[in-house]
């Protein structure tokens, strides 16, 4: 299979989200960034907002493409930087992460779940069938007398036997730890990358005591 050119989009046979031509014209010269949340709580995505007013000058240099903030489902064109929150816990997560890896020059794990699995990975010490039974059959919220079944349908993404950190599925270029990471850490990484500076997160940013 031919490797995609840097300006092409690999999308696992799914069409990229169409982009408004007027919006595309306004993005010329800006660095394209995409974000995605996999198996996590989305707290790391909210940390982007903790950059507060520092976002404004960044947006003069950055165009945010696929993101929970834009509701674009697929990356519409190749991106320079991709931020991934959450671990990998389903076949859909795997496909989404591979799509990001194929279409982002730099891919960054954001937060504990993406870096090492986080809280969702606590289920890794149990068999998947036991986790599903606890959630759907033995749950305290189960309706008495109702038939308890584990849902299965082709349209429901199949759950993986364990939760994986992102780097065990695809190559990740950088890691921003934290649960969630501080907005200062995300800002430093993005600001340094956008301005072509090497970066090294100081330990003070990642200390919580």
Swiss-Prot record:
Keywords: 2Fe-2S, 3Fe-4S, 4Fe-4S, Cytoplasm, Iron, Iron-sulfur, Metal-binding, NAD, Oxidoreductase, Plasmid. Pfam families: Oxidored_q6. It is found in: Cytoplasm. InterPro entries: Hydrogenase_assoc-protein, NADH_UbQ_OxRdtase-like_20kDa, NiFe_Hase_small_N_sf. Its cofactor is [4Fe-4S] cluster; [3Fe-4S] cluster; [2Fe-2S] cluster; FMN. It is an enzyme of class 1 (oxidoreductase). The keyword Cell division does not apply. It catalyses: H2 + NAD(+) = NADH + H(+). Binds 2 [4Fe-4S] clusters. GO terms for cellular component: cytoplasm. Its EC number is 1.12.1.2. Its main location: cytoplasm. GO terms for molecular function: 2 iron, 2 sulfur cluster binding; 3 iron, 4 sulfur cluster binding; 4 iron, 4 sulfur cluster binding; hydrogen dehydrogenase activity; metal ion binding. It comes from the Bacteria. The keyword Nucleotide-binding does not apply. Tetramer of an alpha and a gamma subunits (flavin-containing dimer), and a delta and a nickel-containing beta subunits (hydrogenase dimer). This is NAD-reducing hydrogenase HoxS subunit delta. It comes from Cupriavidus necator (strain ATCC 17699 / DSM 428 / KCTC 22496 / NCIMB 10442 / H16 / Stanier 337). The lineage of its organism: Bacteria, Pseudomonadati, Pseudomonadota, Betaproteobacteria, Burkholderiales. The gene is hoxY.
